[in-house]
């Protein structure tokens, strides 16, 4: 008789406590030991591997280091930096951007004053206090915003080519505020030694708890599949087969390197892809359909047009193009 491992049919959601920033998820039944294994794995990936947006540095006019004080501003620069670390963003933009804020006192500088120049991001905690500007004082502040994962110290945000007076900031990119899990016993038939794992996820509002666990699950799945598909045996090929494989490989690599601007697309689709920073066929097919629909102004009409283009090249969305990328 083959022993069948117990696994949850699906992940349950606690509707009573669910919100846009908090979710409680239940996985049961699990074999003994799997509650802690899965809980630890999900917690680590949620906290360290999900992308987010944060301030990476600032430049204040006539201020040249982070230990300065600013005439007519109640807070000193270190305190302003600490407050700026707490600003949370929602953004689909992959590239770094800069925005300039001019503060004319008397006023309270809150996070809501930080506005994008081209709609690259949205500030979530608009009421967050950053500084108090006294009457007769004007402060000009450049704010540098970037995308990343987890926590990045200020030194790693210090890049070449930054202007004189650039002050790097520790960046907390993770959109997850807190993750915790508990493991309880649960019954299956007459047996009570199975486990129930309860996972609680709190986000900063830039991503829903549902999307966060789904994204974390895909990250874990992509890594585990490397082991599931492992095969040490290598197939033997003739010299002619090797040459054919090389030719097909190079043909595909050249195809994936095709510029989007060379495709016969509508102006709307071109603009959508440009804003999403998708420049080549390879970058396009590496996206899934639902990911593209999340981009601003990207609708089903544009998606249908792109699918028709991909069909011409025998390509599809969601392809793994890792092996074709240049080392």
Swiss-Prot record:
It catalyses: RNA(n) + a ribonucleoside 5'-triphosphate = RNA(n+1) + diphosphate. Residues 1-231 are annotated as: Alpha N-terminal domain (alpha-NTD). One of its GO terms (molecular function) is DNA binding. Its EC number is 2.7.7.6. It comes from the Bacteria. One of its GO terms (cellular component) is DNA-directed RNA polymerase complex. Pfam families: RNA_pol_A_bac, RNA_pol_A_CTD, RNA_pol_L. Residues 247-327 are annotated as: Alpha C-terminal domain (alpha-CTD). Gene3D superfamilies: 5' to 3' exonuclease, C-terminal subdomain (1.10.150.20), DNA-directed RNA polymerase, insert domain (2.170.120.12), RNA polymerase, RBP11-like subunit (3.30.1360.10). The keyword Cytoplasm does not apply. The keyword Transferase applies. NCBIfam families: PRK05182.1-2 (NF003513), PRK05182.2-5 (NF003519), rpoA (TIGR02027). Homodimer. The RNAP catalytic core consists of 2 alpha, 1 beta, 1 beta' and 1 omega subunit. When a sigma factor is associated with the core the holoenzyme is formed, which can initiate transcription. Belongs to the RNA polymerase alpha chain family. This is DNA-directed RNA polymerase subunit alpha. The gene is rpoA.
